[in-house]
Amino acid sequence: MHRLTRDDIEQAASLVYQVMPATAQYAWPLLAERLACSVWVKHENHTPTGAFKVRGGITFMHWLKRMHPEVKGIVSATRGNHGQSVALAARALGLRALIVVPQGNSPEKNNAMRGFGGEVVEHGRDFDEAREEAARLAQLHGLYLVPPFHTELVKGVATYALELFSAAPDLDTVYVPIGCGSGICGVIAARDALGLKTE
């Protein structure tokens, strides 16, 4: 992955803001009092899917349509938020979205993916088996296989960190939940692009 610039992230933000507004970040005084430091919370639960990953889905699908205009649809494996993200973004661009989840996946997540236009296929005991099936279906149906981690996903995710650092540039530390790593990579990319020293 190449180092993202501020311009890269701002261009990604312009795509994201066609679908959703920036999300809020608030200082939480009671939590700050308890921890004896200033605390800011970035409210990515206020996105259309309720998670930051929607930003990466938007930028990835725009990249895909630019780089592979012949693509008619995508397939990806997920347990939820990534699937909602790519389903929403694919539908907005007129692409089919086939989402493979492990058997026994959360019915709420599956229904949310369907609600955003995804065709949900349950396969396998875990994410790895679902991912293998997604690769097979990509070949079978001529769909583009969307990976769980990609530079374009990170570029979109970095937009939430750009918003946070623009609102609160003097943060000492940012805590980020980690799954496949797009969230933490997006925060690091935005921090570095802005020349900040935040840990």
Describe the function of each predicted region.
Residues 1-199:
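PLP-dependent amino-acid enzyme catalytic core
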